Every structure is written in C-alpha cells, then in structure tokens.
C-alpha cells in the first residue's frame, strides 16, 4: 500500500542518544515502504551552521543519504534549525522546501509548514522570526567566527526557555484566524504542521482538517497518510513500526 510519512520536532542532539537511536531504527524499518518522508522542521535541537555539524549529525547525514537512494526526503526548516543549509541538505540527500509548501497528497490538496508562523499571538517571537529570516541577518551570522555563533545560539536557547515558562498556553499555540487565512490562500483541504508539540487531528469547517505532528521527547510521533487513511501514531522508543 502506498503511504507517505511526516515527522517533526525531533530536536536531535548528542545529549539524547535514545532519540537518535529511535530515529535511526525508524529509518531502517520503514526505508523500503513509504513513498516519501517529510521532515517538518526542528530535526535538530540547535543548528548553528553546516560547517559546525557535530559527529552525530554527520552520522545521521550518512543514514539519510542511504535512505534517500530509494525514498525521497523533504525538509522544511523549523525555528531551531532554520540555518540548516544546502551543504548539509545535499550531504543528507534531503530536498529543501520553502517554509510553506503545497502538495497534492493522494488527491487531497494539502499545505505543509513547521507551524511557528501560525502562532501570531506571540508578537515578540514573530518580530524575532521576521528578523532572523532576513537575508542580510543570515549572511552576517554565517560569517561570524564559529565560537561567536555557538555563543549566540546558546544565549537564544536560554532566553527562549525562560520566555516560554511565563507565556500562556494560548499564546504558544496557533491562532485560528492564521490557520483559516492560510487554508484559504492555498486552497488546501488539509494542513500538516508541528512546532506546538500538541499532536492532534483537528476537524475544521468545510470538511477540512489540521493535523499536528508531535515531538520526540518521550516517544516518537509519526503521521502516516495513504490514499485511504490518516493515522497519527505515537511510537514508544524501541517500537518504531509505522
């Protein structure tokens, strides 16, 4: 049976070998089955540049490259790995997609994105997001010394954690009006995203739906879509049969 897999928010790092092993196992078990694998951002906990890839990321690139020889891999940047560039993508066999991407998924018009752009009530974050996406800002950052880039990334992560602790639940979730606007603009019947770490299948008006792929902190989360079914799965680490 044909099917496509979607994952996101793995937040891979050397500090969590259990997540790394679970994702490696997931790739190995499903390599010969799915039509395509879409990674919807935040594959890594942090990414400060293709030239500073850690050993675990280089090993993952080799695994992804092998996977891509028979199954296409598509990647949309998240808020943690928005600096992942063409060099690492090529090394991994991944195709970089724009931050909002429309596809025909077995006859169903769908729109894919990481999801942070939908959290429009978080004004401070949206201001930072606009700044960090500017070409000149990326250019300057990428030309800083490696030590400076790492220091900036560490400071931003720390500030983000502190800020999120005091933000309300609603501010950190997507805004319904932003969802409706994007669905209307793209003509999509289905929206698929991550970012919020709140996996669910939301039934919307006019027979549309919004699917949120979960994170991989305590267990895996995989969305499996075939011509006949939509299945959002939780995968306990060590059990990765999608």
Swiss-Prot record:
A Pfam family: Metallophos
GO terms classed as biological process: lipid A biosynthetic process
Subcellular location: Cell inner membrane
Binding site for substrate: 79-80, 122, 160, 164, 167, 195
InterPro entries in the record: Calcineurin-like_PHP_ApaH (IPR004843), LpxH-like (IPR043461), Metallo-depent_PP-like (IPR029052), UDP-diacylglucosamine_Hdrlase (IPR010138)
Cofactor(s) for this UniProt protein: Mn(2+)
Pathway assignment: Glycolipid biosynthesis; lipid IV(A) biosynthesis; lipid IV(A) from (3R)-3-hydroxytetradecanoyl-[acyl-carrier-protein] and UDP-N-acetyl-alpha-D-glucosamine: step 4/6
Reaction(s) this enzyme catalyzes, per UniProt: UDP-2-N,3-O-bis[(3R)-3-hydroxytetradecanoyl]-alpha-D-glucosamine + H2O = 2-N,3-O-bis[(3R)-3-hydroxytetradecanoyl]-alpha-D-glucosaminyl 1-phosphate + UMP + 2 H(+)
Single GO molecular function: manganese ion binding
Binding site for Mn(2+) 1: 9, 11, 42, 197
Cofactor note: Binds 2 Mn(2+) ions per subunit in a binuclear metal center.
Catalytic class of the enzyme: hydrolase
Enzyme Commission number(s) from the entry: 3.6.1.54
Domain of life: Bacteria
Keywords annotated in UniProt: Cell inner membrane, Cell membrane, Hydrolase, Lipid A biosynthesis, Lipid biosynthesis, Lipid metabolism, Manganese, Membrane, Metal-binding
GO cellular component, one term: extrinsic component of plasma membrane
CDD domains on file: MPP_YbbF-LpxH (cd07398)
Lipid bilayer topology: Peripheral membrane protein
Family indicated by similarity: Belongs to the LpxH family.
Function: Hydrolyzes the pyrophosphate bond of UDP-2,3-diacylglucosamine to yield 2,3-diacylglucosamine 1-phosphate (lipid X) and UMP by catalyzing the attack of water at the alpha-P atom. Involved in the biosynthesis of lipid A, a phosphorylated glycolipid that anchors the lipopolysaccharide to the outer membrane of the cell.
Protein name: UDP-2,3-diacylglucosamine hydrolase
Species: Shewanella loihica (strain ATCC BAA-1088 / PV-4)
Native organism taxonomy: Bacteria, Pseudomonadati, Pseudomonadota, Gammaproteobacteria, Alteromonadales
